[in-house]
UniProtKB/Swiss-Prot annotation:
Its EC number is 2.7.11.17. Belongs to the protein kinase superfamily. CAMK Ser/Thr protein kinase family. CaMK subfamily. One of its GO terms (molecular function) is protein homodimerization activity. This is Calcium/calmodulin-dependent protein kinase type II subunit gamma. The modification Phosphothreonine is found at residues 287, 306-307. The gene is CAMK2G. Residues 324-353, 376-423 are annotated as: Disordered. Its main location: membrane. Keywords: ATP-binding, Calmodulin-binding, Developmental protein, Differentiation, Intellectual disability, Kinase, Membrane, Neurogenesis, Nucleotide-binding, Phosphoprotein, Sarcoplasmic reticulum, Serine/threonine-protein kinase, Transferase. CDD domains: STKc_CaMKII. Induction: Activity is induced in skeletal muscle during exercise. It comes from Homo sapiens.
């Protein structure tokens, strides 16, 4: 049973281990209870940095989590207050995000989607029975208990959850994540439990086709779509979805919350409770591919937001996220060939799934091509799709006609946005330094590589098998034993480089990397990876401080 203690020090009962995640005022670390050797995840909140309102939110989160005991909810086991810190001890869930697990499966069907939403609805029904509304149901908060096949889906993060009075509706403030907000919240009407069902409808839609029902780069237009309930079931991807699945989505995405299906009713829907006979068993490969792109886009947005926090630590007065379009970057003079494709009108030509492992070969005279805005053809989600908002002072809306891209992250002291000209020059600079880094890798030139990278470079890459790698030793092994010893030709193409300028001294670039190489049998091959790099400028010099790459383990393509 979860208990609150103010006299017992956390370290008396638990031993802390590695960091699992980090927020603005908190860090999550693995811990072990000394008396039982049971593993948990400890959310450690620095209460010295919290406002009075934040303290109230922390108390609310702990109070709510203590109520909830369900196999599909991440459980709170302990709540300990100390001088300056508060510790929330939760289940240690090791399976990662549900959506990431789905794209790694060899087989995924409508019946699997039904099983997923069944577990999500079980968790939602449980919290609603306890008069709790989550308010932030989204893929990032749907985790798997373990990496074992068939592991339970667990609902996490009750930081925005509220306590309600039965079915009573009230205005609890503007809170949630843009793509998952309900019409009543956007209208600033009284709301309650039905907002969670609306979010479940959005999640179910994504589970079936891999993209969301409402999406637009402009947050104002996105909100107009949601308030109008303007979604459809386009061909051909929806042609293979059963009518029963569409019926459940329609009942979840009903504009009028009073007529929206409840969690208990949804659990009794034939598509959920009789999935073995009602839901289709056909493998949905297109859904998996679309979902992989959707996941990559979510991760990019998360990386940008994290980098903004890091940038504010470097220079609190310079934290401004520039989200202007990258189309129109002109051809530059550099050591590599640069070819620009015509700009497409596609709003999400950002990332694409990896098809083959990274090649083992490098070249004596590598070439790098940069291609901007190549057509991708995948339906996209809003730029703000994974950014959680809470504003109980009723200031959550974007003013009429104003894009979400015009908004900035909160900061103690922000400077005016850089001019369009200087921003474009900065973006060209980031693309060029990224190109030089890739050339250093293709040349097997570790010395040049180290001059462009921060000594404490952190990275998530396939070769590290999902682990966070810090420092240069891991990369040095590949340079010494593989990259520098190969002489076969290689050509790298950087597709759709998207640069986000973060203040004066930080930037993030995301791109698709195509590598043409000759395999061991002398045949030409092409591999693909999606990569994100975070750059920080120190003493006038750009250094790569973080790197994230998709794909299967092979040779590193840092």
């Amino acid at each position: 049973m979860a208990t609150t203690a103010t006299c017992t020090r956390f370290t008396d009962d638990y031993q802390l281990f590695e960091e699992l995640g980090k927020g603005a005022f908190s860090v999550v670390r693995r811990c072990v209870k000394k008396t039982s050797t049971q593993e948990y995840a400890a959310k450690i909140i620095n209460t010295k940095k919290l406002s009075a309102r934040d303290h109230q939110k922390l108390e609310r989160e702990a109070r709510i989590c203590r109520l909830l005991k369900h196999p599909n909810i991440v459980r709170l086991h302990d709540s300990i207050s100390e001088e300056g810190f508060h510790y929330l001890v939760f289940d240690l869930v090791t399976g990662g995000e549900l959506f990431e697990d789905i794209v790694a499966r060899e087989y995924y069907s409508e019946a699997d989607a039904s099983h997923c939403i069944h577990q999500i609805l079980e968790s939602v029904n449980h919290i609603h029975q306890h008069d709790i509304v989550h308010r932030d149901l989204k893929p990032e908060n749907l985790l798997l208990a373990s990496k074992c096949k068939g592991a339970a889906v667990k609902l996490a993060d009750f930081g925005l959850a509220i306590e309600v009075q039965g079915e009573q509706q009230a205005w609890f403030g503007f809170a949630g994540t843009p793509g998952y907000l309900s019409p009543e919240v956007l209208r600033k009407d009284p709301y309650g439990k039905p907002v969670d069902i609306w979010a479940c409808g959005v999640i179910l839609y994504i589970l079936l086709v891999g993209y969301p029902p409402f999406w637009d780069e402009d947050q104002h237009k996105l909100y107009q779509q949601i308030k109008a309930g303007a979604y459809d079931f386009p061909s051909p991807e929806w042609d293979t979805v059963t009518p029963e699945a569409k019926n459940l989505i329609n009942q979840m995405l009903t504009i009028n919350p009073a007529k929206r299906i409840t969690a208990d009713q949804a659990l009794k829907h034939p598509w959920v409770c009789q999935r073995s006979t009602v839901a289709s068993m056909m493998h949905r490969q297109e859904t998996v591919e679309c979902l992989r792109k959707f996941n990559a886009r979510r991760k990019l947005k998360g990386a940008i937001l994290t980098t903004m926090l890091v940038s504010r630590n470097f220079s609190a007065a310079k934290s401004l996220l520039n989200k202007k379009s990258d189309g129109g970057v002109k051809k530059r003079k550099s050591s590599s060939s640069v070819h620009l494709m015509p700009q497409s009108n596609n709003k999400n030509s950002l990332v694409s799934p990896a098809q083959e492992p990274a090649p083992l070969q490098t070249a004596m005279e590598p070439q790098t091509t940069v291609v901007h805005n190549a057509t991708d053809g995948i339906k996209g989600s809003t730029e703000s799709c994974n950014t959680t908002t809470e504003d109980e002072d009723l200031k959550g809306r974007v003013p009429e006609g104003r894009s979400s891209r015009d908004r900035t992250a909160p900061s103690a002291g922000m400077q005016p946005q850089p001019s369009l000209c200087s921003s474009a020059m900065r973006k060209q600079e980031i693309i060029k330094i990224t190109e030089q880094l890739i050339e250093a890798i293709n040349n097997g030139d570790f010395e040049a590589y180290t001059k462009i990278c921060d000594p404490g470079l952190t990275s998530f890459e396939p070769e590290a098998l999902g682990n966070l790698v810090e420092g240069m030793d891991f990369h040095k092994f590949y340079f010494e034993n593989l990259l520098s010893k190969n002489s076969k030709p290689i050509h790298t193409t950087i597709l759709n480089p998207h640069v986000h300028v973060i203040g004066e001294d930080a930037a993030c670039i995301a791109y698709i990397r195509l590598t043409q190489y000759i395999d061991g049998q002398g045949r030409p091959r092409t591999s693909q990876s999606e990569e994100t790099r975070v750059w920080h400028r120190r003493d006038g010099k750009w250094l790569n401080v973080h790197y994230h790459c998709s794909g299967a383990p092979a040779a590193p393509l840092q």
